[in-house]
């Protein structure tokens, strides 16, 4: 006995997708640019040029191919070329640095893209990625116009997104009996992020300042019955949202408060690295709002030989995704411009927390995800059988290379 699943015939494949002449030489001169955005899923050889088979729908794709079959050269590169020609903003994970070397200059000079390189192999030569960028932007707008409640609301929302991303970066989000401490740490972290964005000078608005402030708040207090954090919060107006966000941590005993502060510190410890500070402490070269409104190519180069920085890849993807969903919600549930995440070697990098939800929720909002793996077993190892199945079920396209 067997089910009804089968391989598609050549005729069915040709009828299911758009046929677009794949002419990168003309595209790079600004000629015959494709009008339909989408993913390249195959090609038909012609005498003078190939015809690309393009799925123009909002779809996710799972590309499976063993090491050495040409996943990057024969699948990723044509898709990046087509994305550039059709004006889609993209995020690309790059384990060897080959992708940005081969396509960074082309995207910038031939297609007019804003190219951003997050280089975790050589952080001192990387573009900046300040996690507090959007929070600081709206803090300044609100400070300039206290009646601008929209900017105030955005500042608070992005602060909560940043805090949630950092807290969940180290675990699944299911903390059992310790959930109180992690939830409280998330609120405390959001409050501290808001304080840094609102009151620090521009050059000090970054995640390392958040770490230093929490570290100082751990110091013993001279006021009996109050810790340093409570004293700091009392200096704020009663209606300040930082006091509200930190409410669970403020109204607790001294020992519990220290545990909450320590939990937040443990999540921030990973950021204390002299090299990583070079990209975390300076202005961001890109944020979610620019990413979806301007043609942008964000390349993340990951050091294969040093997995200690891989957590930052997960963090960048999570934060950009959450911020993009916020932008989509403000535009009627759809991003102003289509975007795609090309997650090359998704099975090699550590688990990206909440990726199952990303695959479930992103598609209808105009964000496509392309997961490139060496085998399904890699997904099961990182996300478990259930998580791997969710990812597979949410990929409308599955392509095997070999």
What spans do the regions from the language model cover?
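Long, basic/Gly/Ser/Thr-rich N-terminal segments
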Residues: 1-16
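N-terminal pre-Walker A segment at the start of P-loop NTPase domains
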Residues: 18-52
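P-loop NTPase motor domains
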Residues: 40-48, 52-367, 382-383
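Conserved ATP-driven motor cores of ASCE-family P-loop NTPases powering translocation/secretion/packaging/pilus
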Residues: 359-402
């Amino acid at each position: 006995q067997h089910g009804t699943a089968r391989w598609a015939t050549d005729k069915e494949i040709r009828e299911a997708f758009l046929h677009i002449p794949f002419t990168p030489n003309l595209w790079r001169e600004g000629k015959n640019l494709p009008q339909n955005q989408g993913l390249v899923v195959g090609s038909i050889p012609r005498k003078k040029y190939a015809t690309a088979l393009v799925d123009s729908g909002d779809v996710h794709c799972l590309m499976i191919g063993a090491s050495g079959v040409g996943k990057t050269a024969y699948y990723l590169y044509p898709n990046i070329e087509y994305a550039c020609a059709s004006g889609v903003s993209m995020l690309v994970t790059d384990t060897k640095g080959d992708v940005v070397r081969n396509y960074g200059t082309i995207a910038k000079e031939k297609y007019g893209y804003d190219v951003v390189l997050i280089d975790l192999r050589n952080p001192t030569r990387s573009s900046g990625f300040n996690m507090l960028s959007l929070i600081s932007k709206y803090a300044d707008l609100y400070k300039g116009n206290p009646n601008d409640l929209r900017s105030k609301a955005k500042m608070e929302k992005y602060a909560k997104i940043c805090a949630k991303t950092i807290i969940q970066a180290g675990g699944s989000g299911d903390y059992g009996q310790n959930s109180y401490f992690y939830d409280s740490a998330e609120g405390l972290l959001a409050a501290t992020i808001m304080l840094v964005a609102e009151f620090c000078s521009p050059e000090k608005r970054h995640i390392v300042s958040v770490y230093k402030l929490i570290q100082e708040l751990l110091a013993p207090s001279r006021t009996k019955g109050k810790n340093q954090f409570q004293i700091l919060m009392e200096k704020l107006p009663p209606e300040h949202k930082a006091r509200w966000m930190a409410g669970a941590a403020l109204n607790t005993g001294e020992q519990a408060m220290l545990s909450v502060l320590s939990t937040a510190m443990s999540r921030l410890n990973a950021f204390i690295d002299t090299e990583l500070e070079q990209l975390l402490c300076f202005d961001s070269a890109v944020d979610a709002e620019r990413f979806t409104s301007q043609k942008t190519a964000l390349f993340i180069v990951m050091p294969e030989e040093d997995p200690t920085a891989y957590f930052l890849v997960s963090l960048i993807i999570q934060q950009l995704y959450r911020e993009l969903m916020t932008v989509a919600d403000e535009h009627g549930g759809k991003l102003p411009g289509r975007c795609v995440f090309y997650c090359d070697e998704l099975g090699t990098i550590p688990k990206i927390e909440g990726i199952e939800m990303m695959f479930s929720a992103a598609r209808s909002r105009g964000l496509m995800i392309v997961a490139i793996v060496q085998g399904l077993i890699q997904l099961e190892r990182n996300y478990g059988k259930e998580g791997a199945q969710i990812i597979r079920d949410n990929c409308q396209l599955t392509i095997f290379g070999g």
